[in-house]
From Swiss-Prot:
NCBIfam families: pyrE_Therm
Protein name from the UniProt record: Orotate phosphoribosyltransferase
Alphabetical keyword list: Glycosyltransferase, Magnesium, Pyrimidine biosynthesis, Transferase
Pathway linked to the protein: Pyrimidine metabolism; UMP biosynthesis via de novo pathway; UMP from orotate: step 1/2
Catalytic activity field: orotidine 5'-phosphate + diphosphate = orotate + 5-phospho-alpha-D-ribose 1-diphosphate
Gene, per the UniProt record: pyrE
Source species: Thermotoga petrophila (strain ATCC BAA-488 / DSM 13995 / JCM 10881 / RKU-1)
Residues given in the record as orotate binding sites: 114, 142
């Protein structure tokens, strides 16, 4: 069902992409396209909330941009608070009056996990506040099982999409221009 939603909304894209991690791929999942349609965002959020419910989450935190809407929808179904972390001078921060209490059970959610870098930054940020990060959830896991957050990781769909280091990218070698659809590094 999730893959069909991604295809129907145009969220599953083909081309030459530079991922937030700096790696390259011929496929990209732009979950912002999925969230253009609230009915599909609700389905995805509810399904992820079902997977995370067993962790008794009090607060759901998503990294900007990919986790902002997702954290809100998942939190609504878990009857939890929703926050997002955003970069300030390249460092993840809780801003806009957001806070977590020491010991508060938090879930970190992200639309797509490839290397897990943004999620790991948010986990470290929450630990600095004394939060108890109990799980991570994502719509798409494209990590190939290579990421370890130190807590349970739940995803709605595992996609084995090609990922290349820039120097090994066959699309670069063919001279195909790359686009960077993610949000990291945008001003």
């Amino acid at each position: 069902m999730i893959k069909e939603i991604l295809e129907k909304t145009g969220a599953l894209m083909e081309g030459h992409f530079i991922l937030s991690s700096g790696k390259h791929s011929s496929r990209y999942v732009q979950c912002a396209r999925l969230f253009e349609f609230p009915e599909y965002g609700d389905i995805v959020g509810e399904e992820l909330a079902k997977l995370l419910r067993k962790y008794d989450v009090e607060t759901v935190v998503g990294p900007a941009m990919g986790g902002v809407i997702l954290s809100y929808v998942v939190a609504r179904y878990l009857k939890a608070r929703s926050l997002f972390a955003e970069r300030e001078n390249g460092v993840m921060k809780l801003r806009r009056g957001f806070f977590v209490r020491p010991g508060e059970k938090a879930a970190v959610v992200e639309d797509v996990v490839t290397t897990g870098g943004s999620v790991k930054e948010v986990i470290e940020l929450l630990k600095e506040y004394g939060a108890n990060v109990v799980c991570v959830g994502s719509i798409i896991d494209r990590s190939g099982g290579k990421v370890d957050f130190g807590v349970p990781f739940e995803s709605l769909l595992k996609l084995d999409l090609p990922v290349y280091d820039p120097e090994d990218c066959p699309l670069c070698k063919q001279g195909i221009p790359a686009e960077k659809p993610g949000s990291r590094g945008l001003k």
